[in-house]
Amino acid sequence: MADSGTLTEIIPAEFGGSAEKVPFEYKANGKELSIASPEPDRTMHNMIYNPNYLTMLDQSNCGMARHMSPAGRNCRIVQNERFIYVRDADSGEYFSIGFAPVYKDYERYECRAGLNYQVVENVTDGIEAVWRIYVPASEDPVEIWDVRLRNTGDKARNMQLFTYVPMNCDGEDLYCGELHRIAEYLSEQRALFICMDAPRYLEGVDLPWHNGFLAIDREPKGWDASLGSVIGPRRTTQNPLAVEQGKCSNSKCAMFSPVGTMQVDMALAPGAQDEVRFMIGACDAAPMIESLTTKYLTGSLEADVHFDALIEAETALSQNLQVKTPDEALNNMVNVWSPKQIDYGVVWTRWGFKGYRDIIQQCQGAVIQQSEAALEQLLKACAHQYESGFGLRGWHPIDDLRYADSSQWMVSAFHEYLAETGDFDTLEKVVPFFDNGEATVYEHLRRSLLRLREDRGAHNLNLVFYGDWNDSLTGVCREGRGESVWLSMAFCRSCLILANIAEKVGKTQDAEEYRLWQQEMAEAINTHAWDGEWYICALDDDGNPIGSEQNEEGKIFLNMQSWAQLGKIVPENRWEQSWKSVCDHLDSGWGLMLNSPAYTKYVHNVGRLSSIRPGAAENASVYTHGNAFMLLALLERGMADEAYELWNAVQPGNPERPVLNQPNVFFNGYYGPSSENRVGMGEHAWTTGSVPWMYQCVTEYMLGVRRTLDGLVIKPCLPSAWENASVQRTFRGTSFDIRISNAGKKAGAAVASITIDGAAYDVTKPLPVDGGSHVVEVTLEA
């Protein structure tokens, strides 16, 4: 879940927020998402970042910025607010480019969220203002602002710009840390410098890179570092004193509430324009500012080598896989935004916290475009596994709460890496454990399953300890005996995957052992976890079922029904009944709920989940991750139309959802029908482990261009609505133009024939990998 300092959520209409459903529009071939209002139905979020710097923006260009130090410290540079005021020096009238916080009526407004950049355009009172923010494709911890004003009228205008950027540069838990802070203007660097250096000289404390700055490409007319001097007494950001007076006071700030405010005056003849560039960033010391300003404060909106390099880098993120289907919304997600969202997950995960299962699953999706970066993170995950096989819950910072599922996620992620690259030598890499000793990657994977095999309860199911995938099942295993059905199913899937890996590298005895483990666990699940119409969620310390018809609330859970298929556990008749139960009890109309009915009162043997507000988070929300698992289960079973219906229901742009959410990125979930006041509103854009699963479901199972340990195979599962589709895929250095014909418009039709460059090809064989380029024609059965 989000921490308390992330982007501001829009206020629901019943509490005074906007009730207008402002539509979104794709531009620039799907690479920009545009909205023509600063007040959408639900706040839009865009993440722009590089490995060391993250800026989180809403549709007004507001949002915080963070710096990841070389030591892994996640330090906040900018607070939530970032405003640019535009003032007419003659009339005293002013507006804010991002609409907030002045909220003055505009003539035209547009926000365009791009890949690692964002542009806001605002035409108010005859002034066209353009404000672009981007983070360069480098490791420099900076963001660049380009601001241009154009006089659209027939009279000369004397205009003023005022920036407003609160910059506490906090992030370390120091006793009275603010007492060491100073913010002042450095004329040589043309920068406001927020300095937190003093603690590094204290005994045992060293905090390099904990300083921030706001720099400009010219000498400002004035500046302020004191928030109090900018706002003034008994005022707010809606009517700041410095802006109303049209003059900064050149104030320093000692200790409390530093702000980056600079004043720029522009004289604009009719039709004329002027442009200024700012840069915000983190630095180790003042001299570093000068090197960064020399590097970055020379470009403009029209000509900027760093912005050009950014566009080139973003294009490379999706070059190995492009799809074309009759569904343009799906195409935009798969071709542009899902690769970007996966990349964000690999680099920043959850705002800098490296959740173990989160980053591993992101790597599972990243191997197509960034196999080396994915492997680097997977090896880090190995290094955060204990010798016993238990994996940490996360790092940055270290979280060792005993969530039992962490390390088993490595099995499927490494499988995807091996299938994509064919780099089986990686299994022999030696990686240290987090506590003691070291082992090969293969042994790390084996230990993850051995840990689960040993941690079993009275029903031979896996012990849940503090929680499994569902973080909030904290009451199931208070006394150390509670068992998780989902984790037992995940163990089954991991056993089968590792068996395939072991067999591929000649470890046939291991493969047989893993398959035996799967069979034993599947038998235990079918014996103890079937409730008559669905699989239960868990058994508590005393063997009482959770997620059962006999429970008052939380009778049925989603994940156990999907993972019964993914772990190859469910018999045919039980699958049919289980799926019917899902449709009967969990369908919201715009995605499947995680459980039902929602908990409305605390249940001791369930724990935190039962105290979460109904419809939120894990308590009966439409959780995207859970829907992704079911989507894969449906595709594995060949249920193409049902899968496509589920995709359309849960995808973020579904117009049937009560709240119109941004359509370009997946949310963690949506408040469910039982929510008191936010039904259908997206929870936490960008930060979800569902993206690689959704991406893989569409590209490898629906379109069927699937990597395996033996190579690339074609096994589509197209919905009946699609007569054709195509995939451009680069795999192990070979390029394939794959064209799929479903002339009979048959759901889930099997492959009838394949030709490669016009010659017939065996439909059961992997495609040839020879470093060349090939046209692959796939005809499905009519």
What role is predicted for each listed range?
Residues 1-357, 372-380, 384, 416-421, ...:
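Anionic coordination/interaction segments
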Residues 322-336, 357, 381, 386, ...:
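Active-site acid/base region of carbohydrate-active enzymes
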Residues 85-87, 366-462, 484-492, 621-643, ...:
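Aromatic-rich carbohydrate-recognition surfaces in CAZymes
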Residues 361, 390-409, 434-436, 459-483, ...:
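Carbohydrate-binding/catalytic loop surfaces
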Residues 164, 179, 392, 490-607, ...:
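Catalytic cores of carbohydrate-active enzymes
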Residues 123, 139-141, 270, 329, ...:
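Secondary-structure capping and boundary motifs in well-ordered enzyme cores
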Residues 138-164, 211-213, 217-227, 269, ...:
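Beta-rich accessory regions
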